[in-house]
Amino acid sequence: MSRSNTATLDSRSNRFVLTHFVWRQIASLAGFVLVGALALAIAALSTWNVADPSFSYATSNEPTNLLGYGGAVFADIFMQFFGLASVVALLPAVAWALVLIRGTHFDKVLKRLGLWFAGSVLASAALSCVPAPITWPLPNGLGGVFGDMILRFPALFTGTFPTGTFATVLACLFTAPAAWCLVYSAGLIGVSEDEEAEPAPEPAPSKARTIRDELEEEDEEGPLTVLMGSLAHMRYTAQARLRRAFGMGAKPAKRQYDEPYDFNNDEFGTLNEPVRPKAQAGRIEPSLDRSERRIVTPPPIMGDEDDPPFDIDERRPAGILPDDDEDDVAADWAPRPAPPKPALAMAGSRVAPPRPKAGQRVEREAQRSFVDEDGDFTLPPIHFLAEPKNVARDASLSADALEQNARMLEGVLEDFGVKGEIIHVRPGPVVTLYELEPAPGIKSSRVIGLADDIARSMSAIAARVAVVPGRNAIGIELPNQRREMVYLRELIGSRDFETTKTKLAMALGKTIGGESVVADLAKMPHLLVAGTTGSGKSVAINTMILSLLYRLRPDQCRLIMIDPKMLELSVYDGIPHLLSPVVTDPKKAVVALKWTVREMEERYKKMSKIGVRNIDGFNSRVEQALAKGEAITRTVQTGFDRQTGEAVYETEEFDLSPMPYIVVIIDEMADLMMVAGKDIEGAVQRLAQMARAAGIHVIMATQRPSVDVITGTIKANFPTRISFQVTSKIDSRTILGEQGAEQLLGMGDMLYMAGGGRIQRVHGPFVSDTEVEEVVAYLKTQGVPQYLDAITEDDEDENDGGGPAGTSNLADSEDPYDQAVAIVLRDGKASTSYVQRRLGIGYNRAASLIERMEQEGIISPANHAGKREILVPTEAEITGR
């Protein structure tokens, strides 16, 4: 009987070993498959781009995702529903893969999956409490659709999405249960109820005898019975395992044993040998880590050398369980889940909100400063600029609100007889672009003419309508209910501004889609800026200047600032980049422009002698010569020898000093044109036509974009223009050649026209006076400006007085009134049009001069024919005497 029982036990053990080995291999294979799936998911999420084709965005462009279209769709679905919590949702899967690779599997599968989903949703809700940055491309928050859905419940009581302290409290309340759910679903916590009851005591020595007695009481079975029993046992075991794996099995009842089984002792090993009690020091509690439990290696089940090796702690012997409890057999024979590891404890940690793509400059400023080669000058640190504020996202930019507005806009257009479909919506920080694909036969001019009607019907302040270049669509731009502010710091510290290869990079602002706009003044090569008072023109000039100061040293770029208003640019007086003090006198402004023209001509002579075509070639040649320790020379013929008649040559050596860029900034062109229009226009025209190769560039701004200020000559030589808000369509056409600037919103909202004529809407950044003053104060500590007196000193004998036909009497005084009186007394003509033509000024200015002469008794009031008499002796009368 004993031998028969031993044979039966041996066959059962062999079947168990084989079944267990197969299941371990399947689990390991599933673990590696899960690792591969995780790698693909991480690759898809890391290369996610909102502009890739997906279920929520239709485009003909090729996907930029690393996994192609499938990866783009997967990443879009996860980002749309979970937001940044998609990364957190993948962490439990990492723990699952590690456990499966070890050949084990989890119990309570459905419960863990449910807690995983709940934890991911709660993590999304916690992230949605964090205000989304202005660079967030999705209409939902950082937690996606699920996060916004959870926050709608507290919003029912507060009336709006949680913000401030309330949002922080909610984020903490969501984070704790989310962390617990994710950690539990990963298998890092959640010990079975049997193991949590109490530590298992040491097995009694009579346990082996009890098992032996039970085996001896069994009837002797033949080979056929053993085979059929084995097949039935394998069938029921597999069935119970599958039912438990998919959650279809009933929860095992809590079982009570006379003496609980100790994993460190193997009763089957004691069937043929006496039981030796273990020492207390070798006892391992079930709650400890698996690696610690494997310190004590138990003997094999049967002690035979032919048995395959496997871990004794990953199975339980069948002899100690009732034969009629098949579900419990499968449950107890199942591999135990791996205990938690410290490396996976971050599964429930909170993910920080994303920041705008900052460049390396922001990171390097904490380590070292930007110092030039000589170590004398340090570029200003970026912390002088204000940080962007975390503003709660606009509820009107949600997907539902945008879809509703698109349908409403289609209805408005259909009311005016324009049929079409809104094919795409691009929400931005200030305005939202709705791309309309008109029906065949609809003219774009017809839709553009409905801009005011569209704004009225949509209850908007203004609406701008323009054709989208390169697409069969018409763009309709409507302002957002809540306007987001663009800060200069996020543009200066962005990767686009830092990594650009442009020479004179200027941060202009952000597009409708939130992309940074960095323009190169060296390629423009000159810039015309126009806009009414309060439109953001002066702030834009400050941002352009700060962009140059944050990127270039004084030996690389020098500035000449002309500010007739004496308020806007005077704050920069004293920085090392200036070639002269800020020019506020209009007469000295003419002198400064003429010096710039002479400097341009001198640079052309130098470049011609060396044989280069532009300033970059000149500086490159100088750097190469300095690196090699050579001198740049040129051999020229100076004449002939009188005795031999041979040509005489001399070697001319050039000064090896690189030429910096020169940027001339004119803040108010209208005032200069009023005082000395012809001289200003002539100097600006020469600079605009020729100064590009010499490294001299002009930024000219005006608040009166009329044809007498922005003349045809100036427009022809300034292909790059920026228009802020203007008052009429005529002014918009004067600047850009088309309407649209009158529909801008002000406060930095601009239309940027590059050299090719393509117009782009840009939202300019804001920089306060305090930020400018701090940067200027820092630059003043870096060095003293080296002014050139020749810039504002006129050594030439000028007799034109600013007009085309002036005489020597006009040069005696710099006052326009004295010049006008001299013209009237000399020529004997006292009319407004005559004074206007002689002085080259505007009609209103000339009329005011005539009225002043009348008040001072120089001329008489106009008679019925408009004629005026000169009441004082004229120059001809005095000469005749």
From Swiss-Prot:
UniProt KW keywords: ATP-binding, Cell cycle, Cell division, Cell inner membrane, Cell membrane, Chromosome partition, DNA-binding, Membrane, Nucleotide-binding, Transmembrane, Transmembrane helix
GO cellular component: plasma membrane
PROSITE patterns, per database record: FTSK (PS50901)
Annotated compartments: Cell inner membrane
Cytoplasmic side: 190-881
Protein topology in the membrane: Multi-pass membrane protein
Gene3D superfamilies registered for this protein in UniProt: 3.30.980.40, P-loop containing nucleotide triphosphate hydrolases, Winged helix-like DNA-binding domain superfamily/Winged helix DNA-binding domain
InterPro entries cross-referenced by the UniProt entry: AAA+_ATPase, FtsK/SpoIIIE/SftA, FtsK_4TM, FtsK_alpha, FtsK_dom, Ftsk_gamma, P-loop_NTPase, WH-like_DNA-bd_sf
Tree of life domain: Bacteria
Chain spans, region Disordered: 194-221, 339-362, 793-813
UniProt: ATP binding residues: 534-539
BP terms from Gene Ontology: cell division; chromosome segregation
Sample GO molecular function, one term: ATP binding
Predominant localisation class: membrane
Transmembrane domains' residue ranges: 26-46, 81-101, 114-134, 169-189
Domain FtsK, residue spans: 514-733
SUBUNIT field: Homohexamer. Forms a ring that surrounds DNA.
Description of its domains: Consists of an N-terminal domain, which is sufficient for the localization to the septal ring and is required for cell division, followed by a linker domain, and a C-terminal domain, which forms the translocation motor involved in chromosome segregation. The C-terminal domain can be further subdivided into alpha, beta and gamma subdomains. The alpha and beta subdomains multimerise to produce a hexameric ring, contain the nucleotide binding motif and form the DNA pump.
Family: Belongs to the FtsK/SpoIIIE/SftA family.
Function, in words: Essential cell division protein that coordinates cell division and chromosome segregation. The N-terminus is involved in assembly of the cell-division machinery. The C-terminus functions as a DNA motor that moves dsDNA in an ATP-dependent manner towards the dif recombination site, which is located within the replication terminus region. Translocation stops specifically at Xer-dif sites, where FtsK interacts with the Xer recombinase, allowing activation of chromosome unlinking by recombination. FtsK orienting polar sequences (KOPS) guide the direction of DNA translocation.
Protein name stated in the entry: DNA translocase FtsK
Organism from which the protein derives: Rhizobium meliloti (strain 1021) (Ensifer meliloti)
Gene label: ftsK
